[in-house]
Structures are given as structure tokens and as C-alpha cells.
């Protein structure tokens, strides 16, 4: 094939065109294009693609003036508009759109590429031409989700102004992701102000479960202040935020939860309350925190176990001594028991220590002998022993009070 004017074969003409483009000799470019019968070829597209990547606005306009089909796509399905967005060239993108470049409103690659550059003008331009701001990618994530991941406060606010939907979720909601770290607190506050569901459970957990597990104290408090349910349970397992805080040894999170109404005796699906976890961890801090705030140690799970089973199995002298002392204090103070059988089971468990390690047992209950309390307190729960204990305590107040002070019991909370 020859051109009209030059009488040259097409390959030679294409070569001359490429050289003229490289030299940015736009006069020659126009002359060659004028003489070519068909400029909507892959070779011409490739020339223009390079022009877009090199931000050559003049060449783009020349091709458009010569009626080049700007909606041609290459072998991977990319149009010139897609390349303009990829190189973040708003001017070329506008030229193409004004010239009739077609936008697939559900082309997530186009929008998400613009989001990568965080260019508000480009996103504004795409929205003006009908892009779906809430289109999901093949993983189910939207532009807003990726912007949140980048912790870009201004861009999040911008997308929300463009009606980005905060309720779209995949495996985790946007609020679940924000709950993973304190650094997202500003963006979290924006979404909460927009009314995102603070108690949404996606997959297994609610946002407060995630915040507590990650020891995100600020996020935990922010969620609570926006009416997050501190006692909401996992979809599978039935654990509450307090269960999780203790499991992860996040003391401050546990303290915040309890101070904001967390149920210290909430059961999971197998009947374990938070104190079961504290006992299994052999952590006296959590044992004391829970018991000081009214947790019941005389409780059994579906396997018939009490927290004391775990205390003794763990073998921590400090935790065992604290637990023994606490159980004895319940009897001394004549606390009303919710599950007398569980209490009896606990006392029998402790009494067995005497058979396995008498010396250790004597260390645990040495203070009890100092009170001159009857030994039967460990094994016999007849009412007559209550009167004996109360009588002994009243005659040995000077010894009893220092003991209580040593373990810092707060029995008004226990009741």
C-alpha cells in the first residue's frame, strides 16, 4: 500500500511518522497523517499510547483532529484513557473524555488506578463522566476501602462527599480494618460520624473485638463512646471483648471494658467466663482485676470444670496462693454463693494439694492457721462452722485485717 502524496509504501511511511513523533515535528506528523488512508491501526495506537505515557498533549490533539478512534483497546484491553489515568495526567484524560472516550462505569481498574495516585482532580473528572464510585474489585474492595488502608484522611472525606458507601463489606468491614491500629483514629471518627454500624459482625468478630485484640486502646474507647456493645459475642465461640482482652494479656483494654460495663461473668459457647482464661494464663493481675470487680470463681463450664482446676493445673505458686486465700475469704466473710456445689468442688480441689505436696499446702494456708481458724473450713460446709469462723475472726481481728490488706480484697464489689 502506498500513501496518496508521497507514493511511499506504508511501512516506510510509518517509519517516517515514528521519527517525526520522536522529534516532535508536529507539522510533518500532520502531513503524514493527512496522507494515510487508515490511521486506526495497532501501530498508530501504539504511537499514541507512547505519547500519552510521555504526557505529549499536542500529539494526542493531532490524532483526535484526524479522527483517530480513541476507544481502541490494545491486547490487554487498555484504552488511551486507562493509560492517561495510570500516568496521572488529568489534562490528557480530559482531552480524551471531551473527545468521546467511553467510560465503563464499573471499570474498577480505572477508578482504583486514580485512587493509587490520590489525585482528587482525576477522581472528580471520572465521577463527572459517570464512574461508579462504589465499584468493587475482584476481591470485593472499593476505592474507599483502599483509601482507608492508606490512612488518607482528606481523600476519605473527599470520597464520602462523592457518596462513597461506608456500609460495603467483604470479609471485614472498613471499621474492622480501622480498629486494628490507633493510627487510624481520625479516619475511624469520620466513618463513625457518618453512621457506620459500630456493632457489625463480619465473618466472626465485631470491630470492638479487633480493637481489643490489637490492644488499640484509643480505638476501643472511641467505639465505646459511639455505643459499641462491650458484651457483644463472637459469631463462633461466643467470646466477648473481655475474654479476648485477657487472652491477649491486654490489661488496659480489660480495665477499660470493665469500667464501661463489661460483664465479668459472661459465658462463651463452652461455659467459660473470663476468669477461666485468667486462670489458664496463670496471671494473678487478671485474676485480681476480675475478682475485685465481682467475677464468680465458683462457676463451672460445660465440662464440669471450675477456674480452680486451671489454677492448680498451671502450678503457679502465686496464683494458687491467691486463689486459696480468696476462697477462704469468701467463707470468712460469709459471702452468698451462687453455685454452692461449684464452691464445694473448688475447696475439694484445693484440699487435694495437701496430699500431693503437704509442705507447699502448708505454705498456702499458713495464714489460715495464724487466724486460728478450724481446719474443717476446707472440707466441711456445715452452718456450725460459719459461726466458728465468725467467732474466731472477731477474736483475731488484728491478724485478719492485715491479711485482707495484703491481698487487697474489695468485698463490697464481690457482693
From Swiss-Prot:
The gene is ANK2. ANK repeats lie at residues 12-41, 43-72, 76-105, 107-135, 139-168, 170-200, 203-232, 237-266, 270-299, 303-332. The keyword Glycosyltransferase does not apply. SMART domains: ANK. This is Putative ankyrin repeat protein FPV034. The keyword rRNA-binding does not apply. Keywords: ANK repeat, Repeat. InterPro entries: Ankyrin_rpt (IPR002110), Ankyrin_rpt-contain_sf (IPR036770).
